[in-house]
Amino acid sequence: MRNIVVLDAPSNLGLRPPAPGTVPGCYKLAGALREQRIVQRLHALEGGVVVPPRYDRGDWQEGDGVFNATAIASYTVRLADRIERHVRAGDFPVVLGGDCSIQLGASLALRRVGRYGLAAVDASPDFRHPGNSDRIGAAGGEEVALGTGRGQEDLTDLEGLKPYLRDEDVRFFGIRDAFEEDRAELAALKIPVVTVGDLREWGADALARATAQAFETPEIDGFWVHLDADCLDPAVMPAVDSPDPDGLLPAELVALLRPLLASPSCAGLNITIYDPDLDPEGTAAALLTDIVVDAFAQS
């Protein structure tokens, strides 16, 4: 039985400001979930915090590439150091974000160790890159593209380890059925995508078990689970920067996560995007914590 270690990665460097003169509030995610006693309820060990650099886009303008890139690069390396240490020790890191750019830290850490896959549970694939968009900037919407080697070198080739993820080792779950253009590109790259509709048709548990089994091959050392809170329907999880309709319901997400987290090949989990600034009563934080705790209940 591996030790679960809860580690904070409260970086908001990869999101655009919600309004002029403000910063994204998702950096408070870790504190909000800790207030819901996630560490105690998971019977987890304390992993501390990897403190991020200041959010400061300076004089960045559209066309300048990824904003906060230097800060994200340095933070990715420091976060990777911490995650790598726990993975090599046989722990199971649960990383509390933060925005989705923290996934780069996990991807880099695991690339140092070997060949790992990614099961990304997200409303959108976060696959924006210069080949499909002229609006590059927010790494929180680009981290899977960056992780697979698409984008600027100061983020895609840290330590000369490009790519951190192979296309064939990535799986997406919870993508909205309406995002046809995104799905078409991923299909052309043969990256499997399970939409919300697919999940309901085929069954979350069966899909997750098949995915975990697919990662249990001699060629792959394991996989990481990336959980973006916006995979949930806004009716139950409105506290995200880009709420998209027709998302997963809590029971569906638990059913998807359980077999993934229970797999001996699963190396860890990160939780991102939930914004306490949009959840003044803390109800969404309570729900998200309940989902994660329930998902580990049989793992």
Q: Can you name each region flagged by the protein language model?
A:
Residues 2-299:
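Conserved alpha-helical scaffold segments that buttress catalytic/binding sites
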